[in-house]
Amino acid sequence: MNNINFNKFKNPITTADGSKRAFIEAKKIKTLWFNTGTLCNIECKNCYIESSPKNNRLVYLTFNEVKLFIDEAINKNLGTNEIGFTGGEPFMNKDILKMIEYSLSKNFKVLVLSNAMRPMLNIKEDLLKLNHQNLVIRVSIDHYQKEKHEEVRGKNTFDVMMKGLLWLNSNNFNYALATRLLWGEEEDQLRNNFNQFIDKYNLKLDAKSKQQLVTFVEMDKKVDTPEITTACWNIL
C-alpha cells in the first residue's frame, strides 16, 4: 500500500504526472445498468460495494426511477438493447419484478445478477410468469466446490444457491454462471471442472462458453494501477 500513488484518477483531463488522459467518446449505451440498492441477504468477502443485510448506503431504486431512464434511452435513441440489474441482491428490491416486466415489454434483453438464494426463491411464482427468452439470470457461484464457495459467501450458502439454480434449470429459464479466479486455477482447467459440475447436476450450460460462464480476474488492492495516457494509442 505504501507504493500506491493516491493522486491518480483525480483529474478527468490529465493523469497524476500531467500527461493527457486517454478516453473514447461514448457513442451509445449498449447495456443500461441499474444498481437496485446495496442491501443483500448475505455478506461476501471482498464484495466490491460491501453489500450486506445492513448496508443501505444506496437506497432501493423505485420502478418509476428505472422507467424514467429506460424511456429516456428509447426516446433519445441511445442504442440500448439490454437492461442490466445488479446490487446488492436485486431480488430484495420490491419493485424488481415490475422493472423486469417493463424492460421486457419494451423488447430489451434483461440481465439480472443474483445469488439465486431466498430473495429469488421467495418470489419464484411471480418470477416464473416473467420467464422469457430475453431474460437471463446470472448466478454468482464463487467455486464449484461447496467449501470454497462458502469460504467467500459464508456457511450454509451453497445448498440454498443450488436450490435456486436447479429451480431456474428445471423451469427452463435462460441463466448463466459467474465465478472467480481466486484459488490459482488456470481458466481452462476451471472451465473443465465446471463442466463436470454442470454434468453432475444436469444443468443446461456449457462452461466453455464465456457467456454462460463468466470469470472475473481478481483485483489486488496492493498493486498500483496505471493510468492510461494518449501515448498508449501508439501501442494499439
Per-segment meaning from a language model:
Residues K54-L68, G88-Q133, I137, I141-V160, ...:
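Canonical radical SAM enzyme core domain
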Residues T31-W33, E82-G84, K109-L111, N134-R138, ...:
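Structural preference for beta-strand elements that scaffold enzyme active sites
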Residues K30-W33, I42, N46-C47, Q133, ...:
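N-terminal, helix-rich and Lys/Arg-enriched segments in bacterial and organellar proteins
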Residues I70-I83, L121-V136, E187-I198, L203-K210:
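Accessory recognition modules or surfaces
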Residues D142, K146-L236:
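Radical SAM enzyme [4Fe-4S]-AdoMet core and its adjacent flexible, acidic
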